[in-house]
Amino acid sequence: MTDYTPQQIVARGARLEAETAADAIDNHPGLEGATYSILEEDEDRGVWRIDAFPTTDEEDASLMALLGGYDLKVSRDTLADADWLAMALSGLPPVRAGRFFVYGMHDRGRLPASTVNLRIEAGAAFGTGHHGTTVGCLQAYDRLIKARRFNKVLDVGAGTGLLAIAAARTGAKLAVGTDIDKPSVRISKENALVNKANARFVHASGLSNRLVAENAPYDLVFANILARPLISLAQDIKRALVPGGTVILSGLLRTQERMVKAAYLSRGFKVVTRIHRDAWATLVLQRP
């Protein structure tokens, strides 16, 4: 087996084509967990952009074939043998989401005095705060804690640990995060130490972990993952919540909102609010 040379695949086109292609990536059996982003690149011209980062020759070929089937201009570049993700994100501006201010070391000299400042460095884990889904979760959580506090919080698919850390920094007595990716769990633990947050992180597929089970039920569950896992985990999330508990769902495109929502409404959940940011949706629902 030969080593794969990292590539960045870029596809540009109209919003409908880009969103439909992104939805197809999510539902492609050979691209489960594929790393990509979708955003509006040029508002005036209505140009949307997908950036995909395959990790194998097979994933590369599948992405090129899939994206080539849409009315999109597709190109690709070879990435340098470096920590390209950190390089790409190191100059990103800080993000403000409600009371939360998410920043990297390069912005440590200009922190607002009236915000909850969370330092999250660029790296291999998802969730620096810049993605529309992460911002949506923070905005939704900020709105919720204006009315109440959540004592026990679970973050499914924690990535960098940002959401669990945000909960720990705003009054949660227990904040637990899970991730299927072991390096992400390590990064989450490091971020909790940096941010002086009493948050715990464990390696788990979904909610399948002893620590998660022992501390259930939770007042609030974050699940910022992908549409299909959100649907498949609906019953597990319901069991993990107290009656009347809240779940914040994200990682889904607007085009996937209806099917994700249906999985929870069929289990008695009620929609509290929803947030749209770029092509992404965040749903806040309450357990019966």
From Swiss-Prot:
One annotated Gene Ontology cellular component of this protein: cytoplasm
Biological process per Gene Ontology, one example term: methylation
Top-rank EC class of the record's enzyme: transferase
InterPro entries the record matches: Ribosomal_L11_MeTrfase_PrmA, Ribosomal_PrmA_MeTrfase, SAM-dependent_MTases_sf
Catalyses which reaction(s): L-lysyl-[protein] + 3 S-adenosyl-L-methionine = N(6),N(6),N(6)-trimethyl-L-lysyl-[protein] + 3 S-adenosyl-L-homocysteine + 3 H(+)
CDD domains linked to this entry: AdoMet_MTases
Record has Methyltransferase as a keyword: yes
Enzyme nomenclature, EC number: 2.1.1.-
Alphabetic keyword roster: Cytoplasm, Methyltransferase, S-adenosyl-L-methionine, Transferase
Pfam families named in the record: PrmA (PF06325)
Keyword Nucleotide-binding: no
Protein's cellular compartments: Cytoplasm
Binding site for S-adenosyl-L-methionine: 134, 157, 179, 224
GO terms for MF: protein-lysine N-methyltransferase activity
Family that this chain belongs to: Belongs to the methyltransferase superfamily. PrmA family.
Role, per record: Methylates ribosomal protein L11.
Database matches in PANTHER family: ELECTRON TRANSFER FLAVOPROTEIN BETA SUBUNIT LYSINE METHYLTRANSFERASE
Annotated protein name in UniProt: Ribosomal protein L11 methyltransferase
Lineage: Bacteria, Pseudomonadati, Pseudomonadota, Alphaproteobacteria, Caulobacterales
